[in-house]
Amino acid sequence: MIYKVFYQETKDSSPRREQTKTLYLDIDAQTELDGRIQARQLVEEKIAYNIELIELLSDKHLEYEKETGAFQLTEF
């Protein structure tokens, strides 16, 4: 399952939409909720990002992300 993680690079200031960045993770999980939990744990263990949202990408959404060139799988 591919998850899109929306985050701010710092926890020191208030989140601003204009500064939101994304990363994509491939998580092996039984359910969507388990995948979100694993994604959050993985990111928080590696980097001190302020995570705003984690969403599971549907097949169509993933294809769109690949077509726009925004998709790049992140590995820790």
From Swiss-Prot:
Q: Which GO terms describe its biological process?
A: DNA-templated transcription
Family the entry assigns: Belongs to the RNA polymerase subunit epsilon family.
Does Nucleotide-binding show up as a keyword for this record? no
Q: What does this protein do?
A: A non-essential component of RNA polymerase (RNAP).
Q: Which Pfam families match?
A: RpoY
Any single GO molecular-function term of the entry would be: DNA binding
Q: So which domain of life are we looking at?
A: Bacteria
The reaction(s) this protein catalyses? RNA(n) + a ribonucleoside 5'-triphosphate = RNA(n+1) + diphosphate
Q: What is this protein called?
A: DNA-directed RNA polymerase subunit epsilon
In the UniProt record, the gene name given for this protein reads: rpoY
InterPro entries recorded: RpoY (IPR009907)
Q: Listed GO cellular component terms? A: DNA-directed RNA polymerase complex
Record EC number: 2.7.7.6
Question: What subunit structure does UniProt give?
Answer: RNAP is composed of a core of 2 alpha, a beta and a beta' subunit. The core is associated with a delta subunit, and at least one of epsilon or omega. When a sigma factor is associated with the core the holoenzyme is formed, which can initiate transcription.
- Which terms are listed as keywords in the entry? DNA-directed RNA polymerase, Nucleotidyltransferase, Transcription, Transferase
